[in-house]
Design a protein with these regions (language model features):
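Short amphipathic, basic-aromatic surface patches that mediate peripheral association
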Residues: 168-189
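Aromatic (Trp/Tyr/Phe) and Gly/Pro-enriched flexible surface segments
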Residues: 23-161, 165, 180, 191-302
Length: 302
């Protein structure tokens, strides 16, 4: 995994196989070796330059030409590489790239500023982070302010792994503070460095008669990387089970994802709704879903 930040460059490189470990057995997540990619060719609208952009998706090797919404039936992976269509204007966003590593590939995740210019009149700048996750994006993107609401987060999953394994490399931007830049708003600073993150949440989900989705948090792994590293191979991170709030190493950001941070999922009516985490489960509870996210920034969307 590589992360890059184009502000001063923050990169995270994921070079896996990404795998889950349980009971002395290691199981690689499908396409988690990152050696196969779908290549998409998207032509942006004439008003913003009619440039053809290349988008990369983790999945069985293929090339797709044309501005069609993408959904991979074979791969469980989604990313921040998406096609957007706002007010009739088509735009492609690219922040995840395949990159050669040894005999195969890794993923390079970047954080940087994207500019959109129209006819030399409008110049919109947005801070974009690179993310690779289990789930899918509901293309085309319609705005930049409701990112989670456009993602189906997580996949059905019923195991209880003890840890997550992957290779990674980090290059931070070197800037002492993050920036806030969401389009037409003025650029501002947020205290503290930007850091790549990894989130793994094991949940027990259910749906009520009105289509609301609720969840208990069964397992938790939250990592924030605050230092530059060369390649770290076979890094092994322990998944914590049950209520972790009494642990000495507990941080508030490891808790329930609520409000603007709530993850979404499709209900039985086909509507993407918030997954409302309402309590802590135990290691004995059934697991129904896993959320797994690798992001180049913990604050690019702030």
């Amino acid at each position: 995994m590589v992360v890059n930040n184009r502000l001063g460059y923050l990169f995270v490189f994921l070079g896996m196989s990404m795998a889950l470990y349980a009971q002395r057995k290691t199981e690689v997540i499908r396409y988690g070796d990152l050696d196969q990619w779908v290549v998409r060719k998207i032509t942006e609208s004439a008003i913003i330059g009619k440039e053809t952009k290349t988008l990369y998706c983790v999945g069985p090797t293929d090339t797709i030409i044309g501005n069609r919404p993408f959904e991979s039936k074979a791969s469980p992976w989604g990313s921040s590489n998406v096609m957007a269509r706002v007010s009739g204007i088509t735009k492609a966003s690219v922040s995840v790239y395949p990159e050669r590593r040894d005999e195969g590939y890794c993923a390079r995740l970047e954080t940087g500023i994207e500019s959109i210019s129209a006819m030399g009149i409008m110049n919109v700048k947005v801070l974009v982070g690179g993310c690779l996750y289990l789930g899918r994006f509901l293309e085309p993107a319609k705005n930049s302010s409701e990112t989670w609401g456009q993602i189906v987060c997580g996949i059905p999953f019923h195991q209880k792994p003890t840890s997550l394994l992957f290779d990674y490399k980090v290059k931070l931007s070197g800037d002492p503070n993050r920036i806030k830049l969401s389009g037409f708003s003025k650029r501002s600073e947020v205290n503290g460095i930007d850091m790549p993150l990894v989130n793994l949440f094991l949940q027990k989900r259910w749906e009520d008669k009105d289509g609301n989705i609720y969840a208990k948090r069964i397992g938790t792994l939250v990592i924030r990387m605050d230092k530059n590293t060369d390649w770290v191979n076979d890094a092994n991170f322990t998944i914590l089970y049950g209520d972790i709030t009494k642990r000495s190493d507990y941080k508030e950001y490891m808790g329930f994802q609520l409000g603007e941070s709530a993850r979404y999922s499709l209900n039985s009516k086909g509507k993407n709704v918030p997954v409302q985490e309402i309590g802590w489960g135990t290691e004995d509870d059934e697991v129904t879903h896993m959320i797994l996210e690798f992001c180049s920034s913990h604050g690019a969307h702030t």
